[in-house]
Amino acid sequence: MAQQTPLYEEHHASGAKMVDFHGWMMPLHYGSQLDEHHQVRRDVGMFDVSHMTIVDLAGPRTRDFLRHLLANDVAKLTVPGKALYTGMLNASGGVIDDLIVYFLSEIEFRLVVNSETRDKDVEWITRHAEPYQVTVTVRDDLALIAVQGPQAQSKTQTLFSSQQRQAVSGMKPFFGVQANELFIATTGYTGEAGYEIALPATQAADFWRQLLAAGVKPCGLGARDTLRLEAGMNLYGQEMDEGISPLAANMGWTITWRPEGRDFIGREALEAQRAAGDGEQLVGLVMTEKGVLRNGLPVHFTDAAGNMQQGIITSGSFSPTLGVSIALARVPAGIGQQAIVLIRNREMPVKVTKPGFVRAGKAVAQ
């Protein structure tokens, strides 16, 4: 039977259409996915993301452990609260998961990992933590609420105590702070400013209702997916998985190669891929005619040598903000500015862009 988050009854009270999402009953929408999408781009919306897994790590060698476990380097994290995005790789360089890691103190770090990969992530982390004597604690006692949009921070702050407002004052993106019972982070999955707030599960429903009263509209998984696609953000299981290299998933920027002596898991395989060159890459596609780009559709183009090449759409949808169809696609190296997508046996032209279409509500790719 599918699990329920602490906000399950709140979703029903707001008329949500519920679906089973990787073993969790989650809201798909509350009546209109399109309205919810625009709500986040233009004002503020909130998402129940309590199905995500929060993992706390503790011990004197936690930093050393994470420098081995993760492709990005936590040596960059020198200011308490600072976070970074990274892949957690297997020995062959495939992506076990993408996650956010927060530096809390020299002996405490926090990870936020995906729900779909929870069991294998926790097993992998725990197994590799043992030689470092790092304590691994899965925080099932916490709920997680994302408040996103241009008005997200101002409206959410009306619910904060004076101490909490002071704690987040001037906080830059990709930081987190514990302020009383709330862990408030300036992160998100929409391309908009906002907060992701972890709080005791027993307090989640009350906080959700306070956000509703403050004018924050609930939004479901449908809008969350089109928002992240417009922002060019990866979805695990589509843009990457254990058989896909981060170099083929627009995650090359999350790999810290120096110092060369840092022996992170997957490094040897990635170095071989990098040396070989000409691997696959993730690109953006924008539809120039009517039609909708869908996951799994083939992408064709002719390379500089005149050879026909084929890739695949990993995520595709209509973009409510741009009014056209957009997609992320994994393709062989050498693609130009135009390609062809086969839709119902029709060859449809698409424009090739960088993987990212909307930032802070504005078009960056058309």
Curated annotation (Swiss-Prot):
A Pfam family hit: GCV_T_C
GO molecular function: aminomethyltransferase activity; transaminase activity
Gene Ontology biological-process annotations: glycine decarboxylation via glycine cleavage system
InterPro entries: GCS_T (IPR006223), GCS_T_bac (IPR022903), GCST_C (IPR013977), GCV_T_N (IPR006222), GcvT/YgfZ/DmdA (IPR028896), GcvT/YgfZ_C (IPR029043), TrmE/GcvT_dom1 (IPR027266)
Positions of disulphide bridges: none
GO cellular component: cytosol; glycine cleavage complex
SUPFAM superfamilies reported for this sequence: Aminomethyltransferase beta-barrel domain, Folate-binding domain
Domain of life: Bacteria
Gene3D superfamilies, alphabetized: Aminomethyltransferase beta-barrel domains, Aminomethyltransferase fragment, Probable tRNA modification gtpase trme, domain 1
E.C. no: 2.1.2.10
Keywords carried by this UniProt record: Aminotransferase, Transferase
Tagged with keyword Ion transport: no
Reactions mediated catalytically: N(6)-[(R)-S(8)-aminomethyldihydrolipoyl]-L-lysyl-[protein] + (6S)-5,6,7,8-tetrahydrofolate = N(6)-[(R)-dihydrolipoyl]-L-lysyl-[protein] + (6R)-5,10-methylene-5,6,7,8-tetrahydrofolate + NH4(+)
Enzyme kind, highest EC tier: transferase
Family: Belongs to the GcvT family.
Subunit description: The glycine cleavage system is composed of four proteins: P, T, L and H.
NCBIfam families (UniProt xref): gcvT, PRK00389.1
Its biological purpose: The glycine cleavage system catalyzes the degradation of glycine.
Protein name: Aminomethyltransferase
